[in-house]
């Protein structure tokens, strides 16, 4: 499984933060999905957050949205995988490509007067760090996820990029999307 054939395509869009919040905030629906996640209420970049989300987002002027789409060759996505093999394929492709974008966004933050990337969930600390620490020990490197802010990723994909969200459901899909973004003030 060393030679996994795939292509990567990236899509970009810039919006004002006011437009972004008004179009894509769907807190109650998104939080329903968050509550099903094993990371819910276990770390300081995932829900629930102790911040005013609208104020946080709109305190910046713009948001750049980057979709990284990993497109698998037909033989790759039609293959049968055990759970461990499927996780291995995803780690060697999707998460590898996601990390490239995250690293670039963290570097890009330095170019603006005020900026913060939305690349969560956080993996810098102990798993379930909320059980260990009463507050985030590394707020300077913690980044929120779009979902923790109540942002509807499915709607972003469809409305801005005309991309349908395909769920994994135990089988590798034809493509996988990661949405990363950076809030900034010039």
Model-flagged regions — what are they?
Residues 3-186:
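Catalytic cores of enzyme domains
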